Amino acid sequence: MLDIKKKINFANVSGEKTDESSSSSAQQSSEQQQAAQPLAPQQTTPTAKATNPFITPMTESTPGMSESWVELAPSRTSLCSSVDINMVIIDEKDKDSRLSPVSIAQSPHVEFESLEQVKYKLVREMLPPGKNTDWMWDWSSRPENTPPKTIRMVQYGSNLTTPPNSPEPEMSQYMPYESDSLFNVRVVFGFLVTNIFSFVVGAAVGFAVCRKIIKHHRHY
């Protein structure tokens, strides 16, 4: 029995030695491989202080705290990005306001095809309810009366035509010119007629008054 126990212990000890030797050989081979590989260059990332001069480390004022970077002033890139975003938002709002339908007198949004419909809507809202507005619509939608391009005017018995781009003629050009002198035929004729009429009326009134006076004296 003792011989068997010794053999078992010897086998265990030999197995442990072989395990240690194999592990040590594996470690040596891995170290050799690492030594054979070239060292990769270390990548250095730019610090916040190098990118922005307005950033100061917190460790300078508080040495007890861990090193951290604080941005005292916004950088130009952040300002430009915020300005660009604001401009885009303003442009979108302007575009929406331009594309929005026409609203009249706080009414719901309704799109009108032409200005005539807008005019008709305004007229109907301004007038009191219960009145017919068809005549107003006909009056507002009718074409404007434009004068003819050529105007014929009578001057001294002749027909003259104005050129198309000439200014409008005055009223004095439509009628022939006549002098208003005292010895004009119309003036003399009117003067004689009025004098004769006034003479006849005066004679009739005088005759009636004289007749009444004579009758009054005869009675007394």
Curated annotation (Swiss-Prot):
Keyword terms, alphabetized: Apoptosis, Membrane, Mitochondrion, Transmembrane, Transmembrane helix, Ubl conjugation
Highest rank taxon of the organism: Eukaryota
Region feature (Disordered): 1-66
UniProt biased composition (Low complexity): 21-48
Residue intervals passing through the bilayer: 187-207
Pfam families for this protein: BNIP3
Post-translational events: Ubiquitinated and degraded by the proteasome.
Subunit structure and binding partners: Homodimer; via transmembrane domain. Interacts with ced-3 and ced-9.
Protein name: BNIP3 homolog
Origin organism lineage: Eukaryota, Metazoa, Ecdysozoa, Nematoda, Chromadorea
Gene: dct-1
